[in-house]
């Protein structure tokens, strides 16, 4: 945000930010893929003067949903792989928008069904945003059927171990699903391994 013209200071654990007038567009390359940094930079750039180019962005579904929302309000945001280009506008307008379903919540329910030998159906949900996690649950023995925007999942009688689970930026295994998968693997038959690559 400093590259967009913001001044800030950190005091007592709080960030105090200010700008003299309007933010200005710039070219920014993130040294590390970060969801929070990508989201905040996109929001700030929407009303900045000129064009902002963000490189090495996070591309989680929630970020794409955020940009769809902002575009519906008048923002000018385009994606090119992990590069995001934002042409600043003078203002945003009122809009009506339906926020996407929570993929971590859906994934957690799917793990719970696998864990408890349950029978679960999730409706009005785009399964592609948790396809990596669903593949892991299939390996664990769950029976999964995807029909349009429905997921049907039946937990196995015996849970199979999964070797070499690794969290990664989307479309990899979500770090927020790591603890749920760990619980599942605790009662699996055999030895499993999970590597946390995002927060540790």
Q: Where do the model's predicted regions map?
A:
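Short, structured segments at the rim of ligand-binding sites
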Residues: 1-200
